[in-house]
Amino acid sequence: MTFYNYLMRHRAPVEKDDATRLANLVFQDPLFPKQSKDFDEISTYLETEAPFYFNLTLFDNVWLSYLEA
């Protein structure tokens, strides 16, 4: 499962946690690397190219949850 697929399982109209917030932001970003399973690629994208801001420390926590899923 890609990180994008993992995030899409957390989409919701009401943001209840960091994963939901990131999922909602990523869903609206057509350039997000949807096929990636690579931490560095996704982290770099969020840091340098994403059209939104998301705290990278929070991203790290969501990534750890992804790895445990």
Swiss-Prot record:
Alphabetical list of Pfam families matching this protein: YozE_SAM_like
Superkingdom of source: Bacteria
Entry similarity comment: Belongs to the UPF0346 family.
Record organism: Lactococcus lactis subsp. cremoris (strain MG1363)
Gene3D superfamilies referenced in this protein's UniProt entry, alphabetically: YozE SAM-like
Protein name listed in UniProt: UPF0346 protein llmg_2280
